[in-house]
Amino acid sequence: MTELVSGRDVLRQARELYAHYRPAVQPTGMKVAVIRFTPAATDPPDWRVRLEASRISAEQKIKSFEHLGFRADHVVLPPGVGRGEFREVLEGYNADPATRAIIVQFPPPRDLAPVVDGMDPAKDIDALLKGRSPYPACATAEGIYRVAEPFATDRPSIAVVGSKGFVGQGVVTMLRADGHDPMTLDHGDRLERVRDADIVISVTGSPGILTPDHIQPHHRVVIDSGFVPQADGSVRGDVRAEAYGIPQNLTPVPGGIGPVEMATLMERVVRQEVDPDVVSWKVTPGPYLERARFTTDRTAAATAVTTAAVPSIAAAARLRGAAGPAAGAPPTSAQPTPAPRGPAHQTGPRPQLPPQGGGGPSH
């Protein structure tokens, strides 16, 4: 059976790890600004859906930063906002010394995108400024990379679907920096090629683009970063629900990469403003079989029975239970570990840190 890689467990761990910074942060008045856009009633439905996802994400960011003791400004710009008004808001936060980080929720309206380039690079905590940000990729991309990393210690084949998008580019950048050579796929490519990968990462935002025809039992982990709100209040990811029982491990939607993004932003702002040696959250992989052993063991199991075939999902489940993981660890859990540091952005003395323990309120 498929093991779910819980992003909510990662976020819970991050909140516990970083709660003890709150008493040091809160008196400083340090602030994070989150700016988002509102659709007009006449906008196309797909645009309204994207901005609804942006709203949900912005609200979760506000909660995460406030949990750490930062003040959080949630700036909601009205439909049809002009470049001048948007630029004025952005420049105000650039000039405000109390504002330590700025996030502009993506996507901005096309005619406003150039204004984002005016953000102070030192406050670009989500890597919106290509080539000028202190970070190599956005928090979502880093979170995806860190979820995939413990499944990829032996340099397996990794497919990234949606590799040309904002998040996808970041994922590919981080994988290549770590020595991987990912298979990059986008709309119009032959998506069935993902069958040949050991790890599948999908960041298209196209509901159900990956079906049971694409997802395979030998896939160590399928990481689904899609998040598309539906009219009935549900949320759909890139992977169809019918494929959820096929891979060995999977990040669910909702409750997968979204919370991981929040944990990454919390870690970044603490490292940037409070403690450069902050302990990092970590994902420990669920059990999985390497493809060579998976194939060999499945063939042996099929030979041992007299019926025509052993169903693939049931066979994979029995094999994992009987043989145990050839790589990986017990089911998903979160353990602290050091991670690459972000920038040392600090214009004044760091707040004095209390002994670790305790924490702020839970949102």
Feature annotation, model-predicted:
Residues 308, 315-363:
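Non-Sec secretion/translocation targeting segments of pathogen effectors
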Residues 1-30:
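Positively charged, low-complexity intrinsically disordered leader regions
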Residues 4-7, 101-155, 190:
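Anion-binding alpha/beta catalytic cores of soluble intermediary-metabolism enzymes, centered on
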Residues 85-97:
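Short, well-structured alpha-helical segments in soluble
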Residues 187-275, 281:
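Rossmann-like adenosine-cofactor binding region
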Residues 62-79, 181-185:
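Short beta-strand elements in bilobed, periplasmic/extracellular small-molecule ligand-binding domains
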Residues 42, 46-60, 135-225, 247:
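Glycine-rich phosphate/diphosphate-binding loop of Rossmann-like nucleotide-binding domains
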Residues 2-5, 9, 260-307, 313-314:
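C-terminal helix-to-coil terminal segments
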